[in-house]
Design a protein with these regions (language model features):
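N-terminal, motif-rich segments that launch catalysis or mediate targeting to/interaction with membranes
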Residues: 1-59, 66-168
Length: 168
């Protein structure tokens, strides 16, 4: 499908979005194209609107996974937790979530619904590219916290590796 390229996006050496890498598709282009499509949502059929909103939710989530931000010269690698080999991408895509607090949909809604108008305005300020730059700057730290084939043991994995990356 045309969306298979939409799960990651590249930055340059200054952590700015690099549209020249994967110009036929990446998460930022996917978000921008979908937002543009939805500007005229009233003229679209309901199924197109629903699928487009699902894409946005998914892609914004992907961009909050540090390994979905692609940096020049940084490649994927493995680490070990309690002797178990973990792909670094998988650590941030699922391991952290599997080991973290799990909220129900209602609990998550309660947390989000407590934002003030001022907080909502701050959260939604700027463009997609501004937000991606901020995300890229912040997410870069994960490549300092672990090196290829590094060994971690529980519960030290949280103190030495995962907690310093919070609130990613």
């Amino acid at each position: 499908a045309h969306t298979s390229l939409w799960h990651t996006a590249w930055v340059d050496e200054n952590d700015e979005y690099d549209p020249t890498r994967k110009p036929d598709g990446n998460a930022i282009k996917g978000i921008e194209d979908t937002m543009e499509l939805l500007r005229d949502y009233k003229s679209l059929d309901d199924s197109t609107v629903v699928v487009s909103i699902k894409y946005l939710v998914h892609l914004v989530g992907d961009m909050h996974c540090p390994t979905h931000v692609k940096y020049p010269g940084i490649k994927g690698f493995n680490i070990y937790v309690d002797g178990r080999k973990l792909n670094y991408h998988g650590v941030w895509d699922s391991y952290v979530l599997d080991c973290s607090v799990r909220w129900s949909g209602m609990e998550f809604q309660h947390i989000l619904d407590r934002c003030t108008k001022r907080e909502i305005k701050a959260i939604t300020a700027g463009s997609v590219r501004d937000w991606f730059h901020d995300c890229a700057v912040y997410c870069r730290q994960i490549y300092v916290l672990a090196q290829p084939d590094q060994q971690f043991k529980s519960p030290d994995v949280w103190e030495d590796f995962l907690n310093p990356a919070l609130p990613i």
